[in-house]
UniProtKB/Swiss-Prot annotation:
Name recorded for this polypeptide: Sodium/nucleoside cotransporter 1
Keywords for this protein: Cell membrane, Glycoprotein, Membrane, Symport, Transmembrane, Transmembrane helix, Transport
Record localization: Cell membrane; Apical cell membrane
UniProt source species: Rattus norvegicus
Main location class: membrane
PANTHER family reported for this sequence: SODIUM/NUCLEOSIDE COTRANSPORTER, SODIUM_NUCLEOSIDE COTRANSPORTER 1
A single GO BP: pyrimidine-containing compound transmembrane transport
Length: 648
């Protein structure tokens, strides 16, 4: 009896759960749309006669909810129309806001205007592609004889080569140092071809198009005024955007720690940037940009879809995150394609670290340009070093898709991005502690050994300054700056690019502060040209400590290909290092000094409160001048900051 009572209670208690308040609304809505009462398969009666009390109550509730059902049906039928109306109203409001902002202050609204124009261009492109994509492809496709098509391609290649030679001849007439950078490109390419895995299988189309895209991007960014201004503006906006990190880090750590301690000043930027990148990835903006860049490289260079997507993704994400974009296809990729994936990871830096390097004071425009230029160059050099000799399964982009992550909403994406970056920050901090400690130990050991044979000041940096000096010179760096640049290259290759950029920022800060160029026999700073070329040369993960990171990341995704990854990882590392060096050579060919000449007479004839690079250059002219061009006031100003025999 007790058991029967218990079963009866259980059955009674389950009834409200099945037909309780949670499901009552949905049940009523479904029944009303079907034109029947809840819990009944019969149609609604004409009147309420003949209904019991429960049925009359349900019928009255049905009648009270009938307008809601009609409204719901109307909205469902005209959902597309309502969407268009909402989008139209929102677009009108945004356009009106933009017009008012531009009329009030165009300079202040410039960023919003540029963002709006970029969005409109992308929307117009998508609309044009959807409406006229197939027709445009048929129009631009060459319909002539295959022999004529071949001769047309050869003619265009010959014209491009002759044009490049003529341009170099005219452009380098005033700046012969640019020819050194061109010679560096030739030497590096010859060395890479000599170490190629399959010399006869090299796809010269991929190599030439990759280097051509790299050169065109560099030409636009470095030499043209619109490109230079655009990338400078973009770099300034990123710096302003990253400055908001201080609000969060100051609240957590305090203003004193954020201003004075490196870890609390730089590393929180990585967390903030990673959070933003995760949000952009959730919204699909990152995938859209990656697909467009990959499409451009694939149609010009003839590479496969998977390897091109990975290299394009490396512009924004790190060497371990980019393979996740093509994770389902890694098991079936050829060795040449895997080599491209590795080379792309070594040749670029992560977007989160880009923010950290900018916070050091490294030129933001050069960092952004180096990351973009490295993508086609990595594809080109990888196909030169490890050409394709197998049949790829991914020649077409059909069937290759990018995922949108696991986040269910915007807040989850932001939180996940911040949480993932904690591991990155901890890894960077640990590596800095370890590498700087190892560097100090190595320098102490080398100094101890050097003292035994009367070699004073022997260190790792000194050895690198001699061994890698020819490499720095082939980049186009002036000979007097080559020892410092060679030191930084050695730190980057054998230790870590983070440490190298930190050292470069100290050289730049001393130059901007107006420090003397030489302190004894040690150079205090390097020229602006050397700084720019070094920024390009250091932009990449190609160092020996990254071998374990790359192998660990890829092996965790495809464990059965561990032997394949181990076979080509060192070759990919060397190729990635050469990508950064070729980037620096291209920058060396294209770089021209910018800025207005300083009027030293007017600058020094007034009271100068602090030294700067301009003050140093003007004071050097004062100390070397034998004419009466500079007054005694100018000499006094210079003698307050610098010791010279003239001042005694």
């Amino acid at each position: 009896m007790a058991d029967n009572t218990q079963r009866q209670r259980e059955s009674i208690s389950l009834t409200p759960m099945a037909h309780g308040l949670e499901n009552m609304g949905a049940e009523f809505l479904e029944s009303m749309e079907e034109g029947r009462l809840p819990h009944s398969h019969s149609s609604l009666p004409e009147g309420e006669g003949g209904l019991n009390k429960a049925e009359r109550k349900a019928f009255s509730r049905w009648r009270s909810l009938q307008p809601t059902v009609q409204a719901r049906s109307f909205c469902r039928e005209h959902r597309q129309l309502f969407g268009w109306i909402c989008k139209g109203l929102l677009s009108t409001a945004c356009l009106g806001f933009l017009m008012v902002a531009c009329l009030l202050d165009l300079q202040r609204a410039l960023a919003l205007l540029i963002i709006t124009c970029v969005v409109l261009v992308f929307l117009a492109y998508d609309l044009l592609k959807r409406l006229l994509g197939s027709k445009l492809r048929r129009c631009v496709k060459f319909q002539g004889h295959s022999c004529l098509s071949l001769w047309l391609k050869r003619g265009l290649a010959l014209a491009a080569g002759v044009g490049l030679i003529l341009w170099l001849s005219l452009d380098t007439a005033q700046r012969p140092e640019q020819l050194v950078s061109f010679a560096g490109i030739c030497v590096f390419l010859v060395l890479l071809f000599a170490g190629s895995k399959h010399h006869r299988a090299v796809s010269w189309r991929a190599v030439s198009w990759g280097l051509g895209l790299q050169f065109v991007l560099g030409l636009f960014v470095i030499r043209t005024e619109p490109g230079f201004i655009a990338f400078q503006w973009l770099g300034d906006q990123i710096q302003v955007f990253l400055s908001y990190t201080e609000a969060g880090s100051s609240f957590v750590f305090g203003e004193a720690l954020v201003k004075d301690v490196f870890a609390f000043q730089v590393l929180p930027i990585i967390i903030f940037f990673s959070c933003v990148m995760s949000v952009l990835y959730y919204l699909g903006l990152m995938q859209w940009v990656i697909l467009k860049i990959a499409w451009l490289m694939q149609v010009t260079m003839g590479t496969s879809a998977t390897e091109t997507l990975s290299v394009a993704g490396n512009i924004f994400v790190s060497q371990t995150e980019a393979p996740l974009l093509i994770r389902p296809y890694l098991a079936d990729m050829t060795l040449s394609e895997v080599h491209v994936v590795m080379t792309g990871g070594y040749a670029t830096i992560a977007g989160s670290l880009l923010g950290a390097y900018i916070s050091f004071g490294i030129d933001a425009a050069s960092l952004i340009a180096a990351s973009v230029m490295a993508a086609p160059c990595a594809l080109a050099l990888s196909k030169l070093v490890y050409p394709e000799v197998e049949e790829s399964k991914f020649r077409s982009e059909n069937g290759v898709k990018l995922t949108y992550g696991d986040a269910q909403n915007l807040l989850e994406a932001a939180s996940a991005g911040a949480a993932i970056s904690v591991k990155v920050v901890a890894n960077i901090a640990a590596n800095l502690i370890a590498f700087l400690a190892v560097l100090a130990f190595v320098n102490a050991a080398l100094s101890w050994l050097g003292d035994m044979v009367d070699i004073q000041g022997l260190s790792f940096q000194l050895i690198c300054s001699y061994v890698l000096r020819p490499v720095a010179f082939l980049m186009g760096v002036a000979w007097e700056d080559c020892p410092v640049v060679a030191e930084l290259l050695g730190i980057k290759f054998f230790l870590n690019e983070f440490v190298a950029y930190q050292e470069l920022s100290q050289y730049k800060q001393r130059r901007l502060a107006g420090a003397e160029e030489w302190l004894g026999d040690k150079k205090q700073w390097i020229s602006v040209r050397a700084e720019i070329l070094t920024t390009y040369a250091l932009c990449g993960f190609a160092n020996f400590s990254s071998i374990g990171i790359m192998l660990g990341g890829l092996t965790s995704l495809v464990p059965q290909r561990r032997s394949d990854f181990s076979q080509i990882v060192l070759r990919a590392l060397i190729t990635g290092a050469f990508v950064s060096l070729l980037n620096a050579c291209v920058a060396g060919i294209l770089y021209v000094p910018r800025g207005v000449e300083v009027d030293c007479v007017s600058l020094l004839n007034q009271t100068v409160s602090s030294s700067s690079f301009e003050v140093y250059l003007c004071c050097r002219q004062v100390f070397q001048s034998t004419s009466s061009e500079f007054s005694q006031v100018a000499l006094d100003n210079c003698c307050r900051f610098y010791n010279h025999t003239v001042c005694t």
